[in-house]
Amino acid sequence: MILFLTSCSEVENTDTVVTNEVETDENESLESRAKRHVEASLTIPVNEKYSLKIYRANLDGDDREDAIITVNRYDFAIEEALKSNNTAKRAEVGYMGNYNYIFYYDGALNKISPPQVISSTPQAELTVKFDNITSQVYQDILIDYRIRNSSYKAIYSIRNHTPKRIFHWKNFDGLGTEQKEAYVLKFGEGTAGIQKDIYILKADFDNPESAEDLFTYSPDLRPTKEVLHHFFFVSSTDMYMTKK
């Protein structure tokens, strides 16, 4: 039996940025702390407009609420494009770059992690959902991000107080073209452990009829019954794999 690690047509797009830890005030709200931490970690000037959102859940199995903090720097992406010699080209590719970030707040430690950058198209902010995939005690993190007219889903699980990506796959591609493709993830009972198996179903969607922004438009995906791939969790690698 040959096992294959999960893969996607895109290159690895997540990196951790090493930063100095920001001093904390025990009585300060998470919203206020997150703002200070984000601005210090990413060296965001006071006059920059950016988006910061906080998504709360139990992500590591203790009795404290944790959180994922997302940051989108679309205005900064435009500013950098205007300063470059390739403004039109950057706009054409959707200002693709390092402008979407996630931070992890550990409720038990009461600390916010360094940022992880998710290279993507900044017109679309990251979308975050939670689900019990690798455990019934805590939830894992599902993040959707855009690369031009395509969309991808990454699944993270907390390891050593840090989000670790354990799976990723394409949601759709070719939006607005005849070469469109789409997939839907379905979770089922684990065959190799308590962690749920992942089934990739072929799906379809309708292209927008009007002049929608293809970098932000989210079509409704219609899954079929056709299973293209079946992944299961391998504890020794801490990743999802498939037989082939």
Residue ranges of each PLM-predicted region?
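Beta-propeller blade termini
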Residues: 51-59, 124-134, 138, 179-191
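Acidic, small-residue rich beta-repeat scaffolds with periodic aromatic anchors
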Residues: 2-49, 146-244
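Terminal domain-start segments
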Residues: 8-120, 237, 241-244
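Acidic/hydrophobic-patterned starts of short beta strands in beta-sheet-rich repeat architectures
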Residues: 59-71, 132-145, 191-201
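Short coil/turn segments at the loop-to-beta-strand junctions that recur within blades
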Residues: 119-126, 170-175
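Alpha-helix initiation and capping sites
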Residues: 96, 135, 146-150
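"Short basic amphipathic alpha-helical interaction patches in structured regions
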Residues: 70, 82-86, 144, 154-159
